[in-house]
Amino acid sequence: MDPEYSELFERLNKQLDNVEDVLKPLKDAESIFELAEGKSELEQAKLYITMSYAINSTLYSFYKLNGIDASERPVMQELQRVKNYISKIQQAEKNVNPKTEAVNTSNAAISSSSSNRPKVAKDAATRIIKHHT
């Protein structure tokens, strides 16, 4: 076998091992809700949107590998919707953990910044996951 190919196969094998390690909690859990247990609402939203992205990007890859024009499929709308949610989650993270806040802020500043934090739409995130499972 060509040494270049053997190196590629070796890298692929290592990457697949990494994927297996990452997916092990999914395999062991009985439901996605079990995975979300004990996490903050923001972490739950990130979990749900990551799962949705993984499912939709896998479907997109399936279409591309089989020569199907994915641009006309609903998966493209779903991927765009997921991208929008990712942006919203990133914005929520910035609002929850603002890096510009000084370490020694007063209690008034802390309480006013926490009242401006956006709420994570837990019901919406749950509906997204139910729709894709």
From Swiss-Prot:
It is found in: Cytoplasm; Nucleus. It comes from the Eukaryota. One of its GO terms (cellular component) is nucleolus. The keyword Transcription does not apply. Keywords: Cytoplasm, Exosome, Nucleus, RNA-binding, rRNA processing. Residues 96-133 are annotated as: Disordered. Its main location: cytoplasm. Residues 102-116 have a biased composition (Low complexity). One of its GO terms (biological process) is poly(A)-dependent snoRNA 3'-end processing. The keyword rRNA processing applies. GO terms for molecular function: DNA binding; RNA binding. Component of the exosome multienzyme ribonuclease complex. Interacts with cut3. Required for exosome-dependent processing of pre-rRNA and small nucleolar RNA (snRNA) precursors. Involved in processing of 35S pre-rRNA at the A0, A1 and A2 sites. Belongs to the C1D family. This is Exosome complex protein C1739.07. It comes from Schizosaccharomyces pombe (strain 972 / ATCC 24843).
